[in-house]
Amino acid sequence: LNVSMDSLQSQPTTFATSNFTGVDDILFRYGAKVNTNLVMDLQCAKVPIVTGQYQDNMPQMSFYPWNFFPEIHPNSNHIVSDKISPVKLEFASTIDTTASSATKTPLLTTSNGTRIMNAPVNVSLNMLKQKQDPKLFNAGAKTVALLLEGEFSSAFKNRLTATMEENTQIAFKDFSDSTAMIVVSDGD
C-alpha cells in the first residue's frame, strides 16, 4: 500500500491506498501474494512526536508506540534470518503463499498481537493519543517476509517476438536455474 510518514507531517490524516507495482502477477506465479492491507502490531517501534517546546524554542520530542511499525523477530530456524536482530518494518502488509512449485519459507512474521487493516486504511497520528484495545489485535502471527526457492518461469515465456527468438545473441530461458528470492512487504 502507498502511505508514508512524510504525508503525515503536513496533514494529520492520510489514506493508505493500493500501490500498483507491476510485479504482483509475477510474484503470484512464483508463490507469493502481497496483500492490500496494513499490519498493526502491539510489538512495535516508537516514533518521535513534537509535544511542546523548550524555553530556547527547541522542539520537545516524546516517543510513542506506532502500531504501523511492527518490530519483527526473525525466524531463527533458517540460516538466512538466524542471528538477525529484530527488524522494524514500516507500513507492512501480509504475504500469503500461492500454489507453485517453489519451496516457501517464512523468514519474518509478526507477533501474535497483530491486527490487519484492509485497504483503504485511514492512517492518523491521532491514533497515538488513543489507547489501543488489545482484543482487536487477534489475527495471530502473519508472514511479512517470505523466501521462495526453486526454478521460476520467465515472465516473458510465450511473449517473445519472432525477431527475438531468432536472435542467437539472446540466451532466453523459459525457466531459471535453481535459485532463490526474498519477498518483503515493507511499505517504506
What are these regions (language model features)?
Residues L1-D188:
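Acidic, S/T/G-rich, low-cysteine, solvent-exposed domains in lumenal/extracellular/periplasmic regions
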